[in-house]
A protein has these predicted regions:
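Gram-negative bacterial Sec-dependent N-terminal signal peptides
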Residues: 1-30
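Active-site metal-coordination/substrate-binding segment of hydrolases
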Residues: 128-202, 208, 219, 519-520, ...
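Acidic-enriched catalytic cores of C-N bond-cleaving enzymes acting on peptides and small amides
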Residues: 238-240, 245-274, 279-333, 337-406, ...
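N-terminal helical capping/dimerization or prosegment-like subdomains
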Residues: 31-146, 416-419, 430, 524, ...
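An extended, acidic, His-containing surface patch that forms the Zn2+-binding/catalytic region
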Residues: 88, 338-418, 422-438, 444-547
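Stable alpha-helical elements in mature extracytoplasmic
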Residues: 61-69, 90, 94-98, 176, ...
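Acidic/histidine-rich catalytic neighborhood of metal-dependent amide-processing enzymes
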Residues: 173-260, 295, 383-397
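Sec-exported extracytoplasmic/periplasmic mature domains
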Residues: 70-78, 103, 185-189, 355-362, ...
């Protein structure tokens, strides 16, 4: 998710994967490690209670967890403008299912509108109600394009690829909710003495609007120690800031081009260019339309398309007198926009396909051709803002600023472009906004065009230092994976950790494994689902049990 230097993410993942391979890591079926074994293998020793209950949880609740995940995935909990979790039928059904599951598992449940609290009270003789272990998750999801799924994204698919649980929300973040609830149930079953209440917070607008959570936190006392399960292992101590640049390329058509002569020729003309599905997904699909395409130009396009790695193209044409109106469909690879290196951006690759050197003459000036020019000149195929003026920079731990055009859509005003960025520490929002404006001003001067609605937003990066649970979480991860001496990491993603005291992210995704949240093939493997249950059960015990 994050990078240190140009290849930070890939290097870290490669190292993690190498460690997994070197230790012949497999999903442990039964882990009860005596102290002598732990010492001999340099694996941290956890309490016997943590190990026993972790094993019990998997043996007892494997099938029930899959069934519960099936139920939660069935609700399309994406934000709908003008509706709230108390008026949207999908959210109402989702909360009803959470309440029913809480009752079945013997956990308390409280509905606060945008926030649901599910808890397991402390049970030690010295019961301090103000002492809590907070578990932070979210129940809303990003949109899913049904055309790109083998079946409905809201039906848990366990058959098309055995071993995978495929569906929207399986990794981000409904799978984590289910895992936390069954970890709490296993702890309750075994009557583990705890002096901390375990409180699971399920927020219902993490993907769209953090203001209701901020409002809730103004009158709610959160735990003094929190775990967010919405990112990756081993432990996340730094998150980049979610940021964006938006602008609109004005409507320009052949009829109002200054050079009227162009309108009377048969020059090939780029008339439409669009792509992307939502702002925090590297787009898998893009498309363009060109009028007056000659056979020679079509051949050039097809040849260039075949040379692009990771891309697939479909060309549809309607020809009259040897000139064709061409519709190009581009298909890349979706990815979470916090990890643009995991995707193949269909928007930028289609723009590269249509770059001006394709023709002997530049494209006539249209909204589409200007949008393509903006993509090629300000972004290119890179992901680190190398071409966007002076924006590019990096932090030694958090890695570089990343950039991905995510949505290009035609509106009444013109072609609206959304660029999603993830920024590390090292520059102020004011400087970044200034550098973005300067880069866009230079581009506008070059093309003699006035962009509309230029805006930028620069979210705050987070660095969490000295959280008391950090070493315990690292020890749990090391014990169950066999990875020796794991270290905290930074990610490009942005989670609700930023709003809670002493909040660290702990899973559910493994290092060295591509994160599938926000993609059009989101899944979690069954093995990972069960490994997460073991690690969460053990971690909850180690952090809440009476010492």
């Amino acid at each position: 998710m994050s990078q240190s230097g140009i290849q930070h993410a890939r290097v870290r993942r490669a190292l993690s994967l190498a460690l997994l391979t070197a230790s012949s890591w497999v999903m442990p079926q039964c882990i009860v490690a005596p102290a002598t074994t732990a010492a001999q293998t340099n694996v941290p020793l956890l309490s016997q209670n943590a190990l026993n209950v972790a094993d019990y949880a998997v043996a007892k609740y494997d099938a029930a967890m899959v069934q519960s995940l099936t139920q939660l995935v069935s609700f399309n909990t994406q934000a709908v403008e003008g509706q709230t979790p108390d008026t949207n039928p999908a959210f109402m059904g989702f909360k009803s299912s959470l309440k029913q599951l809480s009752q079945e598992l013997g956990l308390d449940y409280a509905d606060h509108g945008y926030v649901v609290l599910i808890g397991l009270d402390a049970n030690s003789a010295v019961n301090n109600e103000s002492k809590k272990l907070g578990i932070v998750t979210h129940g809303d999801v990003q949109p899913a394009n049904p055309a790109l799924w083998a079946q409905s994204p809201y039906l848990l698919d366990t058959q098309s690829e055995p071993g995978k649980l495929i569906g929207r929300g399986t990794e981000d973040d409904k799978g984590a909710i289910v895992t936390a609830m069954y970890a709490m149930k296993a702890i309750k079953d075994k009557h583990i003495k705890r002096d901390r209440r375990i409180e699971l917070l399920v927020y219902l607008a993490e993907e769209s609007d953090w203001e209701p959570l901020k409002t809730f936190l103004a009158s709610y006392t959160p735990a003094d120690m929190n775990i967010t399960i919405d990112a990756e292992y081993p432990v996340v101590t730094a998150e980049k800031g979610w940021s964006k640049i938006t602008f609109t390329v004005p409507n320009i058509t052949i009829s109002n081009i200054e050079a009227k002569a162009e309108a009377s020729t048969q020059a090939p003309t780029l008339t439409a260019f669009s792509g992307g599905y939502f702002a925090s997904q590297v787009p898998q699909q893009a498309e363009a339309e060109i009028e007056a395409v000659s056979p020679a130009l079509l051949t050039k396009l097809q040849t260039r398309a075949a040379a692009q790695q990771g891309m697939k193209y479909r060309f549809e044409n309607h020809c009259v007198d040897k000139l064709c109106n061409l519709h190009i469909f581009a298909d890349g690879k979706a990815a979470h926009s916090s990890t643009p290196e995991d995707g193949v951006n269909a928007v930028t690759h289609l723009a590269a396909l249509l770059s001006p050197e394709l023709n002997d003459e530049p494209w006539p000036k249209t909204s589409a051709s200007l949008t393509v020019a903006a993509m090629n000149e300000l972004v290119g195929l890179g992901i680190y803002a190398e071409q966007f003026g002076d924006l590019a920079y990096k932090d030694d731990f958090m890695g570089p600023l990343t950039l991905a055009p995510t949505v290009v859509v035609q509106t009444q005003k013109g072609t609206e472009v959304t660029i999603n960025l993830r920024r590390p520490v090292g520059k102020t929002p004011e400087l970044l906004a200034q550098q973005a404006r300067e880069a866009l001003a230079l581009w506008q001067d070059k093309h003699q065009v006035q962009l509309a609605d230029i805006e930028s937003y620069w979210g705050e990066p987070m660095v969490m230092k000295d959280a008391p649970q950090q070493q315990t979480l690292l020890d749990v991860f090391a014990h169950f994976t066999g990875i020796v001496n794991p270290k905290p990491v930074a990610i490009g993603g942005s989670t609700n950790s930023k709003l809670f005291p002493n909040a660290l992210s702990f899973g559910p995704a493994m290092p060295g494994v591509e994160y599938t949240g926000h993609t059009e093939k989101e899944f979690i493997t069954h093995k990972q689902f069960m490994l997460n249950l073991k690690m969460y059960t053990a971690a909850f015990i180690e952090l809440s049990a009476v010492k």
